[in-house]
């Protein structure tokens, strides 16, 4: 893989900014910028920046190359699971829609052209292990998102079967809230809720088996889905990245502990040592923490997709 670029914020004159999230910038692509022969419909340019967030706060320091690594992991999984579920990618060359004067090398590995879909307003979460907010729910109620689980399970223990635990989609700066399946049905309807649940568990099981063969445990993951004008369901946004998933090295996994993960845990652990109220603005992060975090993302990309950045 070529030398990584660093991008904190993307500004693309001529492409209307639709949304700037914690990590991704999303632009509308005017019809005249699309290549000749592009099918009817609306299209977006989705850019994965190197912004770093923790505790729902965007921090001032980027992780160099993080956006490229996230984009490459997503693209790998979109291709790997295309037989299970269609996705939002179009295959349109990013360079062909960029404004004049913009360096295409800056966006080549961190941006994709996607279909514009109607998002399903629920985060679709699959859990195969009892950790994080699921572990907290279980300790308090013996359930996770209203799903009964056996007594006596321990932290990080593998569940008898993967479970689907939806959550609300929060705005930037707010926190997602776990809901049960009945609440999702009330929000989106039974038919769509069942399609999303079935797709989520099907993809999770496939990805978990693949990752396990490579010495990685996929403990849980979060998907986003959208529908087109005909009601077809697509997986969209990011897919099975270290930001949206909890990956553990299999050789360091131990029930009863919180295993190390391929994500920004170094950053969260550092922030927990500070006298900081977990509200914006966030504190600066030491260079050593930045580099250790970057290396974790790079290792995940290498082990899962066979793509090396170092």
From Swiss-Prot:
Which superkingdom heads the taxonomic lineage of this protein's source? Bacteria
Q: Which UniProt keywords apply?
A: ATP-binding, Ligase, Nucleotide-binding, Purine biosynthesis
- Give yes or no: UniProt keyword Protein biosynthesis: no
GO MF terms listed in the record are: ATP binding; phosphoribosylaminoimidazolesuccinocarboxamide synthase activity
A single GO BP term for this record reads: 'de novo' IMP biosynthetic process
Record bears the keyword Nucleotide-binding? yes
Give the EC number(s) under which this enzyme is classified: 6.3.2.6
Reaction(s) catalysed by this chain, per the record, are: 5-amino-1-(5-phospho-D-ribosyl)imidazole-4-carboxylate + L-aspartate + ATP = (2S)-2-[5-amino-1-(5-phospho-beta-D-ribosyl)imidazole-4-carboxamido]succinate + ADP + phosphate + 2 H(+)
UniProt pathway: Purine metabolism; IMP biosynthesis via de novo pathway; 5-amino-1-(5-phospho-D-ribosyl)imidazole-4-carboxamide from 5-amino-1-(5-phospho-D-ribosyl)imidazole-4-carboxylate: step 1/2
* Any one cellular-component term (Gene Ontology): cytoplasm
Q: Which residues form the signal peptide?
A: none
Q: Which family does it belong to?
A: Belongs to the SAICAR synthetase family.
Q: What is this protein called?
A: Phosphoribosylaminoimidazole-succinocarboxamide synthase
């Amino acid at each position: 893989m070529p030398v990584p670029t660093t991008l904190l914020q993307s500004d693309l004159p001529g492409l209307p900014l639709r949304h700037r999230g914690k990590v991704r910038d999303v632009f509308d692509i005017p019809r005249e910028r699309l290549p000749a022969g592009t099918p009817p419909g609306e299209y977006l340019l989705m850019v994965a920046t190197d912004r770093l967030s923790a505790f729902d706060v965007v921090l001032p320091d980027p992780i160099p190359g993080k956006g490229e690594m996230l984009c490459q992991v997503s693209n790998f999984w979109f291709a790997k699971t295309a037989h299970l579920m269609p996705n939002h990618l179009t295959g349109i060359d990013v360079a062909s829609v960029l404004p004049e004067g913009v360096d295409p090398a800056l966006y080549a590995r961190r941006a994709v052209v996607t279909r514009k879909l109607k998002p399903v307003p629920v985060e679709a979460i699959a859990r195969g292990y009892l950790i994080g907010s699921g572990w907290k729910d279980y300790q308090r109620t013996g359930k996770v998102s209203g799903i009964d689980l056996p007594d006596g399970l321990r932290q990080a223990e593998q569940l008898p079967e993967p479970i689907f635990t939806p959550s609300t989609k929060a705005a930037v700066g707010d926190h997602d809230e776990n809901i049960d399946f009945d609440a999702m049905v009330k929000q989106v309807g039974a038919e769509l809720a069942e399609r999303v649940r079935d797709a989520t568990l099907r993809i999770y099981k496939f990805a978990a088996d693949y990752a396990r063969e490579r010495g990685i445990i996929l403990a849980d993951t979060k998907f986003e889905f959208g529908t087109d004008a005909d009601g077809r369901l697509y997986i969209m946004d990011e897919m099975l990245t270290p930001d949206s998933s909890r990956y553990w090295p299999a050789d360091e996994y131990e029930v009863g502990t919180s295993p190390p993960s391929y994500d920004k845990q170094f950053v969260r652990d550092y922030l927990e040592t500070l006298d900081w109220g977990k509200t914006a603005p966030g504190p600066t992060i030491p260079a050593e923490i930045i580099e250790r975090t970057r290396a974790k993302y790079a290792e995940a990309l290498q082990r899962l997709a066979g793509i090396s950045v170092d």
